[in-house]
């Protein structure tokens, strides 16, 4: 990767490496994206290919100053290194350009079988498109034809925050129609667009010009066709048209919660949409096997995972030549998990983010109240912040279940997730000893620290570090195998 194709920080890493003498050292601080995406490919990976050896690293830590960023510390030795490797203050066998200690087996390839099955939602560009539900309903009451250009608008925040994953706003959508049609067929909605969207688009263009930014094709189109989304994603809506529902996940999230939604809405750019309506695919994507693959090959935004279809989904190797029994098992556990999770969130009135905060909370305990009068600080010291948050929420919310009931329900969700992971492992054939793959993998579900998360939020209910390392190794080898066959 030429230096000009990467960011400035990766360039400095490479330039300093060029300048130091043989057997010299360099040690730098960067945001944690130095080990992700193109920054990794054009920075640390190039350094290693040219004789550099990463012998020390802190993969991710909060910047000690005021800036809300996650940083990495990276030490590089120029030349062969025969001493200890230290990763996150632990001695390891090696450190890769991903700042982990996995075997060096190369990078995953995009697979043809996953092509055109995942999409980013529509990039609207303009707050004027967005309406409150009452405003949209009023416009439809005034003119029933307006329902053809007014839709519920689902974004990542609603998906992860609302207990029923329902959209909280509506949006105008004139598709790719010409201005005359919009003006004549939907005059009330067109007038709103003219008064709100057009000035916003013009202001965005003016600001770019004032900053000396050269205008591209998309900028000119955004100005000239101001009533149309910047990226309407016709290929997305055309692909999902035959389906009854689609699978979605928030693009930026620490939970990575996949769920189904109906297609009668505009899906925002902060959603990744999968042209899939089967529970067996949902089981695989929601499993810890895919979860750790996603974290390995993602980029991050602050400390959250940013799900990119090209680097995560298109490279992910699904089980090949599934037996009918395995497909049935995946369907059944996926459906059971999805239905139980939906009922649980409605019952405790929490969205994905806060529900999974409890899912990963090792101190969750129904015996938080035992008749003693104690301070919030004492409760938090004993049961943890998340447990106290749940207890307070249930106390304040009417007609919601008790802390005992909520605790038992969340523990059952963990059990279902464990069963789903085991069904996915079996679909790959890794639940038993084989000549091709070696010994069976024991997933060993429990609460573990995961090194890719911030220091103050690393506990997850997941598979063991040993299982994670072996799963990622086999998935990468399977990716290479499928790629060669294609």
Predicted regions and their residues:
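Polar, glycine-rich mid-to-C-terminal structural blocks
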Residues: 75-116
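S-adenosyl-L-methionine
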Residues: 1-69, 99-486
């Amino acid at each position: 990767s030429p230096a000009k194709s990467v960011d400035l920080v990766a360039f400095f890493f490479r330039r300093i490496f060029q300048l130091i003498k043989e057997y010299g050292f360099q040690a730098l601080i960067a945001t944690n994206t130095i080990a992700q995406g193109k920054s990794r490919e054009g920075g640390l990976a190039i350094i290693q290919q040219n004789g550099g050896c990463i012998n020390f690293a802190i993969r991710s830590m909060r910047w000690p100053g005021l800036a809300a960023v996650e940083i990495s510390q990276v030490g590089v030795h120029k030349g062969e290194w025969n001493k200890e490797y230290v990763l996150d203050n632990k001695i390891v066998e090696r450190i890769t350009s991903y700042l982990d200690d996995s075997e060096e087996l190369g990078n995953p390839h995009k697979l043809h079988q996953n092509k055109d099955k995942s999409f980013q939602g529509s990039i609207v560009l303009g707050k004027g498109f967005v309406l409150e539900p009452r405003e949209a309903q009023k416009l439809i009451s005034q003119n029933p034809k307006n329902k053809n250009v007014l839709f519920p608008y689902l974004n990542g925040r609603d998906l992860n925050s609302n207990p029923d994953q329902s959209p909280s706003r509506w949006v105008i959508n004139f598709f790719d129609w010409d201005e005359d049609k919009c003006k004549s067929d939907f005059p009330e909605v067109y007038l709103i667009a003219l008064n709100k969207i057009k000035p916003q688009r013009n202001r965005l263009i003016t600001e770019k010009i004032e900053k000396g930014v050269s205008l591209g094709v998309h900028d000119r189109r955004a100005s000239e066709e101001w009533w149309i989304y910047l990226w309407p994603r016709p290929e997305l809506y055309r692909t999902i048209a035959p389906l009854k529902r689609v699978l979605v996940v928030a693009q930026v999230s620490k939970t990575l919660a996949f769920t189904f939604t109906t297609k009668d809405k505009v899906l925002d750019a902060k959603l990744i949409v999968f042209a899939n309506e089967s529970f067996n695919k949902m089981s695989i994507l929601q499993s810890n096997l895919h979860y750790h693959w996603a974290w390995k090959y993602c980029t991050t935004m602050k400390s959250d995972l940013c799900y990119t279809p090209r680097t995560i989904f298109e490279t992910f190797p699904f089980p090949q030549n599934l037996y009918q029994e395995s497909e049935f098992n995946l369907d059944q556990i996926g459906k059971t998990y999805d239905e139980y999770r939906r009922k649980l969130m409605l019952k405790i009135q929490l969205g994905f983010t806060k529900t999974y905060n409890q899912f990963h909370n090792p101190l969750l305990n129904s015996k938080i109240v035992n008749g003693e009068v104690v301070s919030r600080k004492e409760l938090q010291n004993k049961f943890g912040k998340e447990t106290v948050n749940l207890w307070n929420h249930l106390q304040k919310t009417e007609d919601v279940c008790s802390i005992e009931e909520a605790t038992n329900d969340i523990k059952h969700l963990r059990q279902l997730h464990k069963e789903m992971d085991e069904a996915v492992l079996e679909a790959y054939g890794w639940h038993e000893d084989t000549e091709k793959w070696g010994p069976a993998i024991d997933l060993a579900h429990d609460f573990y620290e995961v090194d890719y998360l911030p220091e103050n939020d690393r506990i997850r209910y997941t598979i063991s570090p040993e299982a994670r390392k072996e799963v990622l190794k086999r998935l990468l080898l399977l990716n290479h195998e499928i790629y060669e066959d294609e």
